[in-house]
Amino acid sequence: MLRKLAAELLGTFVLVFGGCGSVVFAAAFPELGIGFVGVSLAFGLTVLTMIYAVGHISGGHFNPAVTIGLWAGGRFRAVEVIPYIISQVIGGILAAAVLYVIASGQVGFDATTSGFASNGFGEHSPGGFSLQSAIVAEIVLTAIFLIVIIGATDRRAPPGFAPLAIGLALVLINLISIPITNTSVNPARSTAVAIFQNTWALEQLWFFWVMPIIGGIVGGGIYRLLFAEKQ
């Protein structure tokens, strides 16, 4: 069990460090930065590579909504849910702390005013999208993510391609929802950066736990009900 938790901690660390790091650093230059496409690729590539790296140890969740969604889909034991989530949150916070230390070396950096890659809705949505829009986006996209994850790891699926499918799904999800909420679908990712943003991101953090978890349960339940092999 300890090896599984260490794998989840490391995987979530790399996800937050790579994905949120791309937002904090590489997307900060209007003309030279990587933009929405680059950020989307960064999140997808970190998940893809870390599933290949440690997925055989822990399953490669790196996301509390995925862990709960897999449980809802009958693919994960309830007794392991809380330990996995704790490891994921710790890994994310450690990554955000490293990002904060690096970013603090830039003259004029302020995590509060920059947003520090935090997720938000309403006035804190990158595109000014409402709470209602954010609810629909986070639930639907997390549900889709779970359906892809469970389907790609189904024993009937082509072997060896699950990390690629999952990583590309996360790229697509980010391309869709960065303008809406800055893309969460992952409470650990949202928590990690919100702690260092330390104002509005913490006030809205409840949303980025509740909605992705609902979406995860919906996605896991849909796959279990409609697509799982009959026993």
Swiss-Prot record:
Q: What is its main location?
A: membrane
| Positions bearing the site annotation: Involved in tetramerization or stability of the tetramer | 20
Which residue ranges does the UniProt annotation give for the motif NPA 2? 186-188
Report the Gene3D superfamilies cross-referenced here. Answer: Glycerol uptake facilitator protein
Q: Name one GO cellular component term.
A: plasma membrane
Q: What InterPro entries does the annotation carry?
A: Aquaporin-like, Aquaporin_transptr, Aquaporin_Z, MIP, MIP_CS
Which keywords has UniProt assigned to this entry? Cell inner membrane, Cell membrane, Membrane, Repeat, Transmembrane, Transmembrane helix, Transport
Q: Where are the transmembrane segments?
A: 9-29, 34-54, 82-102, 133-153, 160-180, 202-222
Q: How does it sit in the membrane?
A: Multi-pass membrane protein
Q: Where in the cell is it found?
A: Cell inner membrane
Self-association state and partner proteins as the record states: Homotetramer.
- State what protein this is by name: Aquaporin Z
Q: Which organism is it from?
A: Photorhabdus laumondii subsp. laumondii (strain DSM 15139 / CIP 105565 / TT01)
